[in-house]
């Protein structure tokens, strides 16, 4: 067996709820070995969250939109916030920046329309790479969309390798801004291409919007508000 080099990777994620930046560190050979490091969350200010959401749009002319001054300004601010969050994270966890081999920078999705052949995440990866002096990988969804895919969800590959040594049938339910499911059987099938994974529908993004609009809260902490209601048995 070939011993693959292990890399220390720092990942940045800003989901469709547009509430902040998630940061995590892993040590991995990219295939069979994953060691999870520290992780943390850095919320957007209410004003910046509002600015981000103001540029969400499913259908748009990308050539024109990418030249819009307002979007460029928000992208620059967003990139700066990621840089600031990384520095806070590294300092808090006493991690030497020179130990980080690569940064995965998802960016903030502001337009996702695979049927029209695009998914657009703002975030200037070149600027971030120059600020950090670390290699930055971005545009994770682009190639899949250009080849007829949906560009989502992203997490199934990670789910597969994270549980590779658990010889069971496994289903992940990821309740993010958009919920998604990942299903595979490690008992009989070790083929990454046979993962069943798909977006299941809106989740926290719509709940957060409703809670903010009606109750002026950021989110339904611990599901306290939801527990006061009742569910529709026919739908369930």
Task: List each language-model region with its residue ranges.
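Short glycine-aspartate micro-motif
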Residues: 9-13, 99-104, 170-174, 197
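Glycine-rich phosphate-binding loop plus the immediately following alpha-helix
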Residues: 19-21, 26, 38-54, 130-131, ...
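N-terminal phosphate-binding or glycine-rich loops at protein starts, especially the Walker A/P-loop
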Residues: 2-43
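Short, Lys/Arg-enriched, disordered terminal segments
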Residues: 1-7, 32-33, 91-92, 98-99, ...
């Amino acid at each position: 067996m070939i011993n693959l080099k292990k890399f220390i990777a720092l990942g940045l994620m800003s989901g469709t709820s547009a509430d902040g930046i998630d940061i995590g560190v892993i040590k991995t050979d990219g295939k069979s070995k994953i060691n999870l490091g520290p992780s943390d969350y850095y919320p957007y200010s209410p004003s910046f969250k509002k600015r981000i959401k103001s540029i969400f749009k499913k259908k748009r002319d990308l050539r024109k939109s990418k030249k819009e001054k307002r979007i460029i300004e928000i992208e620059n601010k967003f990139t700066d916030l990621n840089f600031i969050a990384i520095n806070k994270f590294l300092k808090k966890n006493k991690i030497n920046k020179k130990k980080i081999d690569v940064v995965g920078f998802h960016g903030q999705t502001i337009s996702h329309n695979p049927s029209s052949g695009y998914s657009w995440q703002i975030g200037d990866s070149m600027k971030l790479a120059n600020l950090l002096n670390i290699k930055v990988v971005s545009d994770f969804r682009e190639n899949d969309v250009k080849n007829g895919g949906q560009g989502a969800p992203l997490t199934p590959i990670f789910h597969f390798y994270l549980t590779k040594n658990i010889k069971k049938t496994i289903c992940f339910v990821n309740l993010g801004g958009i919920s998604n499911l990942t299903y595979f059987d490690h008992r009989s099938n070790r083929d990454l291409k046979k993962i069943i994974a798909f977006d299941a529908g809106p989740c926290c993004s719509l709940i957060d919007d409703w809670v903010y609009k009606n109750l002026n809260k950021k989110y339904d902490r611990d599901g306290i508000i939801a527990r006061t209601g009742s569910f529709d048995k026919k739908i369930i």
